[in-house]
Amino acid sequence: MTTRWEHKVLTYKLGWKAFDYAQIERDLTVLGGEGWEAVGTLAPSFGAGQAIEIAVIAKRPVGD
């Protein structure tokens, strides 16, 4: 039997000087308690600039 997955993407905007990593950690802790697992990140940047947004991709098995 093949495992079916559901996915979630969390996005975070760059703050005044940095990303709020403490908030990201809190969010991941809550999601982990709900069965979500972070499986990837995206930090797109345009040109020579710094990424202004990051995304965390999570998945968890879908219950039948």
Language-model segment annotations:
Residues M1-D64:
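Terminus-proximal functional modules
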